[in-house]
Regions:
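Low-complexity intrinsically disordered segments
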Residues: 38-136
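Short beta-strand scaffold segments in enzyme catalytic cores
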Residues: 4-9
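Intrinsically disordered, low-complexity, charged/polar segments
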Residues: 139, 180-205
Length: 205
């Protein structure tokens, strides 16, 4: 398969797909962490032009240079035979991942993925970097596992920055509540925006 790759949306006709071309570093050891990083960041689907742009941005920040990355359509006959194909689902998973897991010696271990995630993260602008807790897991913890007094790091969807807060209470329906919005007009116990189910978060301690 070589070390070139074409990363394209799993949806639709392969012959008409806009995707990202990698001239080097196209093996699973590079591509898997890059795709996982985009999932962690919560980017729009890869089938959306915005998703393609975000992946290219992350790659450009990480690899640098001027010649290794391109945005292009698949050739009329589909993905070129000398390019490793990666079909990306709308939730940022590699649809044909089992092929590489079984047959590619470059398939990375969990430790290697985490190490590269940290390298990718450090290469991004400081304001865009994510906390280590998010790099360690792409899944939000079960709300029922969160306890009063625990510290969580969460993504503020308005300002798109990561913040920390302490769980202040558990609502009657079992949803943890923070105390980040509080005013005489709308006390924190009544403000729906304090409910943790509305955020992407990880438990710090």
């Amino acid at each position: 398969m070589g070390n070139r790759a074409f990363i394209y949306p799993a949806k639709g006709n392969t012959k008409k797909k806009l995707g990202v071309y990698l001239h080097w570093n196209g093996g699973p050891d590079s591509v898997i962490p890059l795709i996982k990083y985009c999932k962690i960041r919560g980017f729009r689907p890869f089938s959306d032009g915005y998703g393609v742009a975000r992946l290219a941005t992350v790659m450009g920040n990480f690899f640098g240079g001027t010649l290794c990355i391109g945005i292009e359509y698949a050739s009329p006959d589909g993905v070129d035979s000398d390019h490793t194909p990666y079909a990306i689902t709308d939730d940022w998973e590699i649809e044909n991942i089992e092929e590489y897991r079984l047959h590619d010696s470059d398939y990375p271990t969990d430790k290697q993925v985490l190490e590269m995630l940290q390298e990718i993260n450090n290469a991004q602008p400081e304001k865009d970097r994510v906390p280590l807790e998010f790099l360690k897991s792409t899944k939000r913890p079960n709300l029922k596992s969160v306890k009063v007094g625990q510290t969580v790091v969460y993504l503020d969807p308005v300002y798109e920055v990561y913040k920390t807060a302490t769980v202040a209470a558990i609502d009657p329906d079992g949803v943890p509540r923070l105390k980040i919005y509080d005013s005489p007009f709308c006390p924190w116990k009544e403000n729906h925006n304090n409910r943790l189910d509305g955020y992407q978060f990880r438990i710090v301690k």
